[in-house]
Amino acid sequence: MASVVLRNPSSKRLVPFSSQIYSRCGASVTSSYSISHSIGGDDLSSSTFGTSSFWRSMATFTRNKPHVNVGTIGHVDHGKTTLTAAITKVLAEEGKAKAIAFDEIDKAPEEKKRGITIATAHVEYETAKRHYAHVDCPGHADYVKNMITGAAQMDGGILVVSGPDGPMPQTKEHILLARQVGVPSLVCFLNKVDVVDDPELLELVEMELRELLSFYKFPGDDIPIIRGSALSALQGTNDEIGRQAILKLMDAVDEYIPDPVRVLDKPFLMPIEDVFSIQGRGTVATGRIEQGVIKVGEEVEILGLREGGVPLKSTVTGVEMFKKILDNGQAGDNVGLLLRGLKREDIQRGMVIAKPGSCKTYKKFEAEIYVLTKDEGGRHTAFFSNYRPQFYLRTADITGKVELPENVKMVMPGDNVTAVFELIMPVPLETGQRFALREGGRTVGAGVVSKVMT
């Protein structure tokens, strides 16, 4: 998945949580949200989707603005989903979005029952400057794993904090996770300001928020913090803290979150997020393209999570994004690829679709890791050789074991160490690839592959 470590070129030590990390490494880590919202999950079982005319009947996607992936993160009930719905409503009035109701974003039965977001939901909208894909990340502690899959594809994040409550436990965890999975920039929305009577309280909350951002190595003093009420914007009341605040927020997102650099000149590679079967047409794999370009008619290989490491072969017969047809998909796009000759059960989340011959799979690799401290949300105690955490590599979530060097008996929280890691199944790996280690529902370490082995 991701890393918060960087090799200092002037030393052999890994530098954790450095402010230089993302400017040097970039945020190329890819892991995707549940794209069923984008590809039309409800449509997948419909007869219209299964007809041969479906792909031809969709509108064509026009690529006339930079495409940027953003998302809302923050504590449960602080208003992330309300803000997402409010953004689409306000921009729809400007002719730059389709308004999506709160219930459409929060649409899983268990979400409505519990009033929280579980699967990462997805909407699209435009500003005068950009085209945005927006992920609404869950805030409930039980679903941090889903938050990771949403956050890792963001080019920038919108951190939502309730004015009356201030930063809460999941606020802190989401800021930490945003740092770990490589979200390069954050903009903050201080929500529910209409229910705060004392303006000094908002000043204190803003001060606390800036200190928290600085603690996790974001530029807390510089990050724009927009005050407003997502509910007022959604209901069309109190224009100043409602509609105007949303427009001000989108201006801040346009200006503060830099245009992402897309890797278009490398061979095509897309980690699979989800898989659907379309009767009479084939299998659709969804995900965010990590690098390169894919065109209709091109041959691809599907690698990873297969014993023996032999790749599957297929041809891409359709490329789709936001229910619109693309002639080609390129790095940064969240797409569905229609694959010829494959069954739904042949492929799974965590595999990678790549240009034939451009990618190899490995079980064993050497990596440099930074072990998070207790204060950073990591382990309280040391670990030893044969420690078996979960490895998050792109969209794969796979068990593996740690083999420490002979001269290292144990690794303490806060340590940097070079070790050998062995996964239970092969996955595509390359030098410089970042990943996270998780155990018991928390991130305990992050690293970068230094050498692939077998």
From Swiss-Prot:
Keyword field: Elongation factor, GTP-binding, Mitochondrion, Nucleotide-binding, Phosphoprotein, Protein biosynthesis, Transit peptide
Localization of this protein: Mitochondrion
Region ranges (G1): 74-81
Region feature (G2): 115-119
BP terms from Gene Ontology: response to cadmium ion
Location of region: G5: 229-231
InterPro entries: EF-Tu_GTP-bd (IPR041709), EF-Tu_GTPase (IPR050055), EFTu-like_2 (IPR004161), EFTU_2 (IPR033720), G_TR_CS (IPR031157), P-loop_NTPase (IPR027417), Small_GTP-bd (IPR005225), T_Tr_GTP-bd_dom (IPR000795)
Region (G3): 136-139
Region (G4): 191-194
A UniProt-annotated Pfam family: GTP_EFTU_D2
Transit peptide boundaries: 1-51
PROSITE patterns: G_TR_1, G_TR_2
Entry's Gene Ontology cellular component terms: cytosol; mitochondrion; plant-type cell wall
Residues recorded as bearing Phosphothreonine in the entry: 82
Residues bound to GTP: 74-81, 136-140, 191-194
Molecular function as annotated in GO: ATP binding; cobalt ion binding; GTP binding; GTPase activity; translation elongation factor activity; zinc ion binding
Residue span(s) of domain tr-type G: 65-261
Function of the molecule: This protein promotes the GTP-dependent binding of aminoacyl-tRNA to the A-site of ribosomes during protein biosynthesis.
Entry's family note: Belongs to the TRAFAC class translation factor GTPase superfamily. Classic translation factor GTPase family. EF-Tu/EF-1A subfamily.
Stated name of the protein: Elongation factor Tu, mitochondrial
UniProt organism field: Arabidopsis thaliana
